[in-house]
């Protein structure tokens, strides 16, 4: 069977295509390596019709990076190791009062290391990390904010937090605003940690941004091999039957053959 060339990104990976030939049935999957073509920030913020700066052309670049991390085992392993080595085992200090604080830094009973580890994970994954600080009488609580939910305001003075930018991208009532330090409002402020990146004034970029295609290929190779093992139709011989056969009969024959040759333990059988 002839292998089909890769199609454009307009086709989804799960789509199947059948040829119109009457006596033969061909099926193949199309892979979608949907790497963002350009990762830029708007040069003229006056042209941006929202109060925040979009991150990526579709404002979903952080979501893409998070999904890529879940799909590529190599990428996930590298980022996890960097996070573990950065966060260490624990924070230690001599001051007894400070020692008690770092064991419990917020109302969720998280330690300073718990929060710091999440910040390090976001920093390495997205090139950005956000820590929310909530002041109260006698101290301050520290919280990690999921970087995929945050967009920076045009003014650079606050952030917008949205649990679903894909669904509620234009509904401000679904968002919360938190000022960026040193501004404080309602006893809250956020500290934005980010990588420096030329031409980027609002967001940082992760170190691996130049390797996005290679990371995607790592995932696609694994998916290709897995699909091949499950659905590979490679008998050790080809049997040709002379005579006319209708489309329905041909399809039935293909189905019966696939039951025998497709699946675990059936490769190379005849």
Show where each model-derived region lies.
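Structured, contiguous alpha/beta core segments that scaffold functional sites
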Residues: 2-270
């Amino acid at each position: 069977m002839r292998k089909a060339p890769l199609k454009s990104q307009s086709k989804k990976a799960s789509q199947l295509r059948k040829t119109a030939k009457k006596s033969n049935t061909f099926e193949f999957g199309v892979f979608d390596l949907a790497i963002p073509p350009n990762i830029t920030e708007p040069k003229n913020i006056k042209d941006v019709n929202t109060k925040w700066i979009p991150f990526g052309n579709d404002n979903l670049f952080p979501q893409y990076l998070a999904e890529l991390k879940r799909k590529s085992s190599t990428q996930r392993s590298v980022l996890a190791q960097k996070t573990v080595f950065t966060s260490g085992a624990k924070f230690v200090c001599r001051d007894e009062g400070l020692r008690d604080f770092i064991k419990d830094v917020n109302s969720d009973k998280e330690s300073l290391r718990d929060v710091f580890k999440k910040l390090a994970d976001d920093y390495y994954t997205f090139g950005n990390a956000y820590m929310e600080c909530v002041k109260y009488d006698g101290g301050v609580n520290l919280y990690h904010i999921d970087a995929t939910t945050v967009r920076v305001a045009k003014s650079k003075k606050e952030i917008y937090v949205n649990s679903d930018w894909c669904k509620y991208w234009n509904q401000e009532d679904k968002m919360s605003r938190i000022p960026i330090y040193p501004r404080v409002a309602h006893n809250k402020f956020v500290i934005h940690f980010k990588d420096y990146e030329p031409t980027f004034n609002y967001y940082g970029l992760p170190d691996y941004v130049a390797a996005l295609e290679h990371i995607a290929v790592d995932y696609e190779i694994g998916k290709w091999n897995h699909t091949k093992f499950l659905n590979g139709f490679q008998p050790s011989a080809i049997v040709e039957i002379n005579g006319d056969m209708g489309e329905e009969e041909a399809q039935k024959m293909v189905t019966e053959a696939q039951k025998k040759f497709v699946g675990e333990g059936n490769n190379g059988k005849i």
